[in-house]
Amino acid sequence: MRATVVRRTALAASAAALALLATACSGSSDADGKDDKGAANGSSSAPKTPAKALTAAELEKAALAQGDVKDTKITKAGPADEVPADGVKVDKEACLPVAHALSGVAQEGAVATTKRKVIDEPKADGGKSLEDAAKGEGADAFKDAFNLTSTFVALSSYEGTAGPDAFAALKKAAADCAGGFTATVAGTPTKVVSMTEEKITGGDEALAWTVTSESDGATTPVKLVALRKGSSVATFFAFNLAAAGGENVTFELPTAVVAAQDEKLA
């Protein structure tokens, strides 16, 4: 891959990520021994009695913090990362819950929300730096420098059955919109061409997808995970720039991040 192509691919991939997150580009085990199959398939396991929502303070305590996920940098999302719910538009109304999840917007009914950015730390193995890639030292430099995954986590609490209802709404939207839709975030349109369900377990319910978007003939894969535990729902949007650039990079679900959040909600 020529240097100019590498740079162009990096810019295009960055733009695709920013369109989905506006400005926030950034398999856990079942500890209680519950039915993994049900969780993996997103089956409903709504509480028999109304659940009490975590307060804003309790939610902050349950949110991820530096040191919770090995080899990552965890920070609290700032004002520049926020996307207002009314700033997300879709061409198919049924797909709005998915567009919200991809943008870090809480699902309907949330009483409190906090957000985190979890970014892989560069490996100290002598790989190429971002500076090398910018200078155009070839495809290997691009792959080494950008083979880092960023995950945006939105953790929300709900009263009563609103948590299970929000999870169910997202599950239905993902099924209804598997064939694609167009989302416009902060005025920037993004064409989602497919949503493919992946296997994941955790919490009371968990679902995951590979979401593929398209721009100027180039496709960009991202990962989306939803986890519900009690009255809390977390969504995870993960993006790997090298994978988006078409490099031969294995881009997995952010299972370590999901597992860490699941544990903190115990």
Model-derived features with residue positions:
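A small/polar (G/S/T-enriched), proline-flanked helix-loop surface module common
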Residues: T75-T220
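Sec-dependent bacterial lipoprotein signal peptides
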Residues: M1-T23
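Post-signal peptide N-terminal regions of Sec-secreted extracellular proteins
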Residues: G160-G163, A175-A178, A244-G245, T250-A266
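Extracytoplasmic/secreted envelope proteins and their assembly/folding machinery
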Residues: E60-Q66, P164-K171, T255-V258, D262
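N-terminal low-complexity, Pro/Thr-rich disordered segments
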Residues: A10-L11, L21-L64, V90-E93, H100, ...
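Extracytoplasmic/periplasmic mature domains of Sec-exported, cell-envelope-associated bacterial proteins
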Residues: A46-P79, V211, T219, E247-T255
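A short, solvent-exposed beta-edge/loop patch
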Residues: V193-V258
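Sec/Tat-exported extracytoplasmic proteins
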Residues: A63-K76, A174-F181, Q261-L265
